[in-house]
């Protein structure tokens, strides 16, 4: 019997969203939400470890990955959270557990605050936190024609390898599959124009007062060597989220789904029980 492809697409609020659905009827649904400059690809090591136990959905947040690089969508965290909710409503999911990495953690928290009845628990993997909105000068700059070329130049200068070296602790983990998986979406020229809008529209992270209203059970997992979102941010989020627990992983950087998939999968399974 031929295996059913998990690849799906659905249009929510006028933007076409790519997602993967590893169906396991009757089981708890997990929704994997990736971080900035990433995609569902970042969960590729975690999903095989959990797919026998759970119904898993992993999406590409626009404009990243294989989702549409819309030039009309308003790229706020609130709107991206609505896309997550829209996919779940389309699939008639009654209740889910959010698993958000980095920026995806903020979007997961926004989704849980927007529609609390849809989500039972939240898992935050090195979640971003307490970031302010972009400086007004940068926001103004996004209105300048060809600003997208500055973004392209910046990303080209940094390069996929340099970015990966910055987000993992053990450099030996970086291989050709990883470089290709994280770099391929940026071969589409349209992403740079969409990212201009993303920079323009992105609001700041949730304020402490908003976080304190989040009474869902929350599991926080952090890499002790995270140079992107340091451990101190995890401790602050743990203090502000009233029903949270924090685990730290030694010898681990920011890209925890790639670096510690087995350990993360075990923590998630224990948390959901």
Swiss-Prot record:
GO MF annotations, alphabetized: carboxylic ester hydrolase activity
Enzyme Commission number(s) from the entry: 3.1.-.-
Enzyme class, first EC level, given as a word: hydrolase
Active site: 102, 254
All copies of domain AB hydrolase-1, residue ranges: 29-131
Keywords attached to this entry: Hydrolase, Serine esterase
Family as reported in the entry's similarity comment: Belongs to the DmpD/TodF/XylF esterase family.
Protein name: Uncharacterized hydrolase YugF
Species of the source: Bacillus subtilis (strain 168)
Gene name as annotated: yugF
